């Protein structure tokens, strides 16, 4: 279930915008943060390893379960080091199922919460980033005179006087 919820593009554009609009001091504002999570295609364990892109840097998020913890999921962030992937001990979480999603806790107050619509990230300072899941959509604009459409709009008001 967690493996189905995680993939997507998340952004805190609303949070960053309203922090500025409310006039919060610079040090209290949440900067714009975009996170893209995708399943790793070359994973030896599909549904267990993900690419996590944040601020132009890529990490791997590896999910594992253990018989020692029948209800928790271990989520470890790995960073590239010395030509390979190494677990960052400051970014290892224990994730549990909660109402409508999953909640993870880690060292130093690190917290992560994911649901169908959002991702909350707290680096440990108690002031989390609220990232909303982006929705993909297509927009087809009808521009008069372009693409073979009729150009009626340009002539609709000819001869109309006030």
Protein language model features and the residues they cover:
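Calycin-type beta-barrel ligand-binding domains and close structural analogs
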Residues: 3-9, 13-23, 32, 47-162
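Short secondary-structure subsegments characteristic of cysteine-rich extracellular domains
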Residues: 27-41
């Amino acid at each position: 279930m967690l493996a189905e919820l995680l993939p997507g593009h998340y952004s805190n554009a609303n949070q960053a915008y309203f922090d500025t609009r409310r006039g919060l001091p610079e040090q209290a504002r949440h900067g714009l943060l975009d996170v893209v999570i995708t399943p790793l295609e070359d994973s030896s364990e599909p549904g267990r390893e993900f690419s996590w892109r944040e601020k132009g840097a890529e990490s791997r998020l590896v999910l594992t379960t253990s018989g020692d913890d029948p209800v928790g999921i271990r989520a470890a962030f790995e960073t590239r080091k010395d030509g390979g992937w190494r677990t960052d001990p400051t970014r290892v979480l224990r994730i549990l199922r909660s109402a409508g999603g999953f909640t993870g806790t880690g060292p130093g107050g690190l917290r992560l919460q994911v649901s169908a619509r959002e991702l909350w990230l707290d680096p440990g300072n108690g002031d989390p980033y609220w990232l909303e899941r982006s929705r993909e959509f297509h927009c087809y604009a009808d521009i008069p005179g372009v693409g073979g459409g009729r150009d009626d709009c340009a002539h609709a008001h000819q001869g109309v006087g006030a």
